[in-house]
């Protein structure tokens, strides 16, 4: 009788060990299937169809979309256009909300802009704001060359003279207040000139040079010829009308 009871106990123990081993084998095979699937890399829980649903502590959960399909991934760093947002329950990749931003530090602070845009104080611009210049090496807006206000227009002159000519040039200038941070950044023009009419064409008490007299005489002669031709044309027209 005792032998029968002992045999029965051995059978029960063997069955329990077998069930335990089978359960461990199933869990090991399930874990192995996670590891073998590239989608499940770094996951705490994963499925073949939906990918990761929970990530390991230091990784970021990213929901990747491919056409109509979407699946979860666990990444060490977030892809372009996203930033890593850490939270007690699970770290996630959140989308950058800044226009034309390629990578960002937070939802409202960009660290790198898309191609063709310049970074300035966490935002992206196609042209740098006033007072800043584009630095092509880093695609950032840096402090440019700062200049002061324009001066008043100077005296109209020509050949260092303020009389003796009909037309001259007048100039105005401005000063560089702050030099740019890079020598490659050019400053805007600090002097400009424009054509002006002299207030005194003839210098007081001055004598005209022979060249100036000759030029004036030629001009008078040309006007007299033009006037004579005009009068002759009128005379011919009147004569024809009378005939």
Curated annotation (Swiss-Prot):
Per the UniProt entry, the effect of residue 105 to A is: Loss of LGR5-binding, no effect on interaction with RNF43 and ZNRF3, no effect on WNT3A signaling
Q: Which domain of life is it from?
A: Eukaryota
The residues covered by the TSP type-1 domain are 144-204
GO process terms (BP): bone mineralization; canonical Wnt signaling pathway; dopaminergic neuron differentiation; embryonic forelimb morphogenesis; embryonic hindlimb morphogenesis; epithelial tube branching involved in lung morphogenesis; limb development; lung growth
Which regions are flagged for Basic residues bias? Answer: 204-224
Sorted alphabetically, which keywords does the UniProt record give? Developmental protein, Disease variant, Disulfide bond, Glycoprotein, Heparin-binding, Secreted, Sensory transduction, Signal, Wnt signaling pathway
Q: Which SMART domains match?
A: FU, TSP1
* Ranges where the record places region Disordered: 204-243
Where does it live in the cell? Secreted
Q: Mind telling me which InterPro entries this protein's record contains?
A: Furin_repeat (IPR006212), Growth_fac_rcpt_cys_sf (IPR009030), R-spondin (IPR051514), Rspo_Fu-CRD_dom (IPR043601), TSP1_rpt (IPR000884), TSP1_rpt_sf (IPR036383)
For this protein, the record's Gene3D superfamilies field holds:
Hormone Receptor, Insulin-like Growth Factor Receptor 1, Chain A, domain 2, Thrombospondin type-1 (TSP1) repeat
Free-text function comment from the UniProt entry? Activator of the canonical Wnt signaling pathway by acting as a ligand for LGR4-6 receptors. Upon binding to LGR4-6 (LGR4, LGR5 or LGR6), LGR4-6 associate with phosphorylated LRP6 and frizzled receptors that are activated by extracellular Wnt receptors, triggering the canonical Wnt signaling pathway to increase expression of target genes. Also regulates the canonical Wnt/beta-catenin-dependent pathway and non-canonical Wnt signaling by acting as an inhibitor of ZNRF3, an important regulator of the Wnt signaling pathway.
Q: What is known of its domains?
A: The FU repeat is required for activation and stabilization of beta-catenin.
The molecule here is called R-spondin-2
Q: Which gene encodes it?
A: RSPO2
